[in-house]
Structures are given as C-alpha cells and as structure tokens.
C-alpha cells in the first residue's frame, strides 16, 4: 500500500492530502482488511524517506501497531512500482533505488517461503472479504500463473454513500503478482520479472495473467482522487448498499472531509474536462519546471 502519490517530489501532495488519505484509510480500507476471512497476509505500507518522522505517519504506525488481526510493516524508501508520471529513465532509476532500500526492510517479514504474493492495495480502495483466501487458492491450483487480477468491481462515493458498478475496459490496478522469493528480494531481478509493466493496463503483456470475473473491489471516490471521480466513464448501474456487507462496510458512515473550493468546482465539470485541466495546470506544468531544474 503506497502512502504517497505518483510523479514529482516522490509523490508528495502535502499534509492536508495526507491527513484526508489517512482518514479514508482508517474509515474504509482498514475495516475491509479486518473483514478478510483469511488473515494470513502482511500489509506493507510504503512511505517516503522524508516522511519517516512526520507526525501523521508516526501516529498511523502506532495505530497499525495496535491492530492484531493482521501484520503490518512500514518501509521508508518510497514507491515500489513503476511511476508512469515520470520519464522512463527517471522512473527506472528511482524504482531500482527504492527497491534496494525497501527489500532490506522487508526481509524479516518474508520468512522461509518459496514465493511471495504481492497484491496491489491502494490506500483508498477496498477488497471483498474473501479475496485473500481466493487468491491464495487460485495460485495453489494454477501454479503456472504469474499474476491474477479482477476485471470488474464497484465504485463508491465515500462522501454520499452512493454505490455503482465499475466496468473498466482495460485491466484495473487490482491484481496480485507471484514472485519466486529469490527474484522478489533482488531489486534488478524484481524489476525485470515484471517486464517492467509501466502501467497496470499492460500487466498481462508481461506476465502469464489469470482473471477472476467476480466483482471483488471497490474504487473509492472522495474528492481527493487524482484521476478517478464518481462521474467516471467506467461507472455502471447503481447498486444496493447491501453489497457492502461483503466488504466489512455495511454500517460505514459517509466520509466527512474538507475539500477545497477549487476541487469542489472541478468535480462539477465533465470527466474529460477535469482530466484536461489536471494535465495542463498540474502534471505538464510542474514536469517542465522539474526537468529544467534537473538539466
């Protein structure tokens, strides 16, 4: 679980963003993890080195240390998958560096296993309660698979409680990669084993990929998302909140966070317009400044 964004400054988006993301994590994601029928997993939370002593991060670590249902490990070397917001060279160099720093921190938690299953767990999205059990079973029954993912799920407006189908036309970032242990713990082998895939849509081009058709994840929308909003084109039919009981979220209240006027106005625009404005005034502008300073 990356507790950071993508792009410049290691994905740092400010203390307000972090405060709101931690609130989402505690209110929605943690209950869905506690609801897993199989708790034989370790929640790996990756944080930037610069945030190791951040008050909010330290408080969050203490919070997870108090949870006994599953193990949690924090690492402080940044994002450990390909950052497609950066140029290929910068993304590759940064990923190798981050993996070098992270693997050492993870070694004591890996143990004497032959393989490591690494599941993408966003810090604001949720999995159905049988996902851990189901994924481990699929890899036992089909050992030739290198990755398994879900193609469809739900999306939820955490602010209003609205729930709908989520029907992407490409592979969404809800999959598990199976690494041989000796590959997982070697940064260069780790990178090459995954392709590297440069965005979740292309994971099946790099690894032998299996799919699960059952809707088993929730994409959370809360006003602080970088790209996914509740008016997304992949949004399908509205569904009953009854499905939330299978995610450990049946009685979860609506999220209450402060959203800036700028973001409130942005959410009122059509999805395509929102994406264009984010690119023009965000990613493209700051990328040019960043590349100029690096030159």
What are these model-derived regions, one by one?
Residues 17-30, 57-59, 97-100, 133-134:
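Well-ordered, non-membrane alpha-helical segments in soluble/globular domains
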Residues 176-295:
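C-terminal catalytic/acceptor-binding lobe
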Residues 10-15, 49-117:
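Active-site-proximal specificity loops/subdomain of glycosyltransferases
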Residues 1-11, 47-48, 75-79, 151, ...:
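Short loop/turn segments at strand-loop or loop-helix junctions that form parts
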Residues 86-111, 119, 128-208, 212:
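Conserved catalytic core of nucleotide-sugar-dependent glycosyltransferases
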Residues 17, 28-40, 62-67:
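Short, acidic, metal-binding catalytic loop of nucleotide-sugar glycosyltransferases
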Residues 1, 13, 32-33, 41-46:
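Hydrophobic targeting segments
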Residues 121-123:
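Active-site acidic Asp-centered loop
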């Amino acid at each position: 679980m990356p507790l950071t964004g993508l792009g410049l400054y290691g994905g740092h988006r400010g203390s307000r963003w972090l405060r709101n993301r931690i609130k989402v994590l505690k209110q929605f994601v943690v209950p869905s993890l506690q609801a897993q029928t199989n708790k034989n997993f370790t929640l790996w939370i990756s944080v930037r080195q610069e945030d190791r002593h951040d008050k909010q991060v330290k408080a969050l670590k203490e919070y997870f240390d108090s949870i006994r249902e599953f193990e949690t490990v924090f690492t402080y070397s940044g994002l450990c998958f390909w950052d497609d917001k950066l140029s290929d060279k910068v993304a590759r160099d940064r990923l190798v560096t981050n993996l070098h720093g992270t693997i050492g921190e993870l070694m004591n938690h890996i143990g004497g296993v032959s393989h490591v299953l690494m599941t993408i767990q966003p810090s604001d999205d949720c999995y159905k309660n049988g996902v851990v059990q189901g994924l481990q079973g699929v890899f036992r029954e089909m050992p030739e698979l290198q990755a398994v993912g879900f193609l469809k799920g739900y999306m939820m407006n955490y602010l209003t409680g609205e729930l709908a189908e989520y029907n992407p036309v490409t592979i969404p970032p809800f999959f598990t990669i199976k690494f041989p242990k000796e590959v997982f713990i070697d940064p260069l082998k780790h990178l090459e084993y995954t392709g590297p895939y440069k965005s979740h849509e292309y994971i099946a081009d790099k690894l032998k990929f299996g799919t699960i058709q059952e809707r088993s994840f929730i994409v959370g929308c809360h006003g602080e998302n970088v790209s996914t909003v509740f008016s997304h084109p992949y949004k399908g039919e509205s569904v009953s909140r009854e499905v939330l009981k299978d995610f450990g979220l049946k009685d979860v209240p609506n999220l209450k966070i402060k959203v800036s006027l700028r973001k409130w106005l942005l959410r009122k625009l059509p999805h395509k317009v929102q994406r264009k404005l984010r690119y023009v005034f965000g990613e493209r502008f700051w990328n040019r400044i960043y590349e100029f300073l690096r030159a």
